[in-house]
Each structure stands twice: as C-alpha cells, then as structure tokens.
C-alpha cells in the first residue's frame, strides 16, 4: 500500500490504520504447522488456503485489535494485494462518513457508505467518527 498525500496533506484524525488483505495458496492443509510451499495450481484455480489481513491469519482480531474510543475520528487505508479476490470492505457497526473510492484523494468522497468494493490491486481510504464503544472488526 503506497500513500501519496495531496499537496498540503490530509486533515488530522484521532486514529489511522493501514490494512492490507491478501490470499495465501499453500500445498499443506489449513493450519498445518511449519514451512508451507506455494501451490501454483491453487492460485490458478483461485482456491486460497487463507485470506489474511496484514499478512497474518486472525490479524486485527484478538492479538492486535484496532481500538478506538467513542467520539474519535478514524481513518483506514485499505488495500487488496490479491492476486485474485476483491473485498467488500466493511467495519462491523459503522457507516463510513467518507469513502475515497479507488484511493482517489483529490476527487470528492462518497458519503454515508456502509460497504465499499476494493478490487485486487486496488485501495481505498475511509473515514468515520465512532459512536459506540468496541473494537473495529473488518
């Protein structure tokens, strides 16, 4: 995920998170311990063994949750490394105040969006103000 800020930068927010979604194609079965070889046949058949956030299974859930306080403004930079699947990016319990579609930070944002599509190789930026306590789960 590469960020090129517009001239003058972005307005300040209370919390920023960078999240990348990806797929892992292994020869071994799901959750097999140890070294895993890459499986090109599964890649070509679009059958990943894992979908990961920030390169890890279960990331951003229990071990490294995205924590915010009520009333904070949040910005999430979200990208999909793919190589095959798109993402219907949604934060449980939130409506995005602003969505910068396809990562365009110079175009007017979409407003009041619940879910935004991010294609493989694409990115978006979303902003919202939290209204209830809890962890942010994508």
Regions found by a protein language model. Give the residues of each.
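Copper-binding active sites and cupredoxin-like electron-transfer domains
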Residues: 1-138
């Amino acid at each position: 995920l590469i960020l090129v800020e517009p001239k003058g930068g972005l307005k300040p927010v209370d919390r920023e998170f960078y999240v990348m979604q990806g797929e892992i194609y292994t020869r071994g079965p799901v959750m097999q311990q140890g070294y895993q070889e890459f499986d090109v046949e599964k890649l070509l058949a679009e059958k990943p063994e894992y979908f990961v956030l920030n390169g890890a299974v279960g990331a951003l859930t229990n071990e490294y949750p995205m924590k915010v306080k009520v009333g904070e403004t949040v910005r999430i930079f979200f990208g999909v490394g793919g190589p095959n699947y798109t993402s219907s990016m949604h934060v449980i319990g939130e409506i995005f105040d602003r969505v910068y579609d396809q990562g365009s930070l110079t175009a007017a944002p979409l407003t009041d969006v619940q879910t935004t599509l991010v294609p493989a190789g694409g990115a978006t930026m979303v902003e919202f103000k939290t209204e209830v306590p809890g962890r942010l789960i994508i």
